């Protein structure tokens, strides 16, 4: 593959606009760019989680796969009307959700983000994913969007919650439970 980006600083965005993949320009605060930015931030947080040295290999492989899907989603959002994320990617998340959740004990109480460092990072990914999902919902209220990306982010946030629990156990720990009857 040749050089896709040979010039990084183009100065074309200095006035507060940015170019989309179809050649159009939009404000850097547009709903579409906010959604792209939130997806990009999520992908970066997943990249940070992937730097954890003791991640189970199956979790590492799933997260790397998800990073590629999120990059595709960013591409889809950067070209209005373009479709990259489809039902099979959502189904893959459903499969991983069922697989990982089946091995976990039932929750009797809410859990707090934390436990091990990888689990805490997975919770950060989950909350950024929820924000990206909200941005996509807002964009979808303003213009027509493919349905799969919204479904994908909804499932992904659930999967990241489950993976946080898995990662706590993989590190020899457990979930941090919310204490309903704690002293003030």
UniProtKB/Swiss-Prot annotation:
Listed EC numbers: 2.5.1.-
Catalytic activity reported: 2 cob(II)alamin + AH2 + 2 ATP = 2 adenosylcob(III)alamin + 2 triphosphate + A + 2 H(+)
UniProt xrefs under SUPFAM superfamilies: Cobalamin adenosyltransferase-like
Gene Ontology MF term list: ATP binding; corrinoid adenosyltransferase activity; GDP binding; GTP binding; transferase activity, transferring alkyl or aryl (other than methyl) groups
Annotated keywords: ATP-binding, Cobalamin biosynthesis, GTP-binding, Nucleotide-binding, Transferase
GO biological process: cobalamin biosynthetic process; protein homotrimerization; protein repair
UniProt activity-regulation remark: Is potentially allosterically regulated by GTP/GDP, which enhances its affinity for AdoCbl by 5-fold. Binds cob(II)alamin weakly in the absence of ATP. The presence of ATP (but not GTP or GDP) increases the affinity of cob(II)alamin for the enzyme, and stoichiometric binding is observed. GTP blocks the transfer of cob(II)alamin to IcmF from ATR, thus averting its reconstitution with inactive cofactor.
Top class in the EC scheme: transferase
Sequence segments annotated as region (Disordered): 1-21
Pfam families: Cob_adeno_trans
Coiled-coil region list: none
Amino-acid positions noted as binding ATP in the UniProt annotation, renumbered to this chain: 10-13, 18-19, 28, 130-134, 154
Family note: Belongs to the Cob(I)alamin adenosyltransferase family.
Function description: Adenosyltransferase that catalyzes the conversion of cob(II)alamin to adenosylcob(III)alamin (AdoCbl) in the presence of ATP and an electron donor. Acts as an accessory protein of IcmF that functions in cofactor repair, since IcmF is prone to inactivation during catalytic turnover due to the occasional loss of the 5'-deoxyadenosine moiety and formation of the inactive cob(II)alamin cofactor in its active site. Thus, receives and repairs the inactive cofactor, which is then reloaded onto IcmF in a GTPase-gated step.
Assembly with partners or alone: Homotrimer.
The protein's name: Cobalamin adenosyltransferase
Native source organism of the sequence: Cupriavidus metallidurans (strain ATCC 43123 / DSM 2839 / NBRC 102507 / CH34)
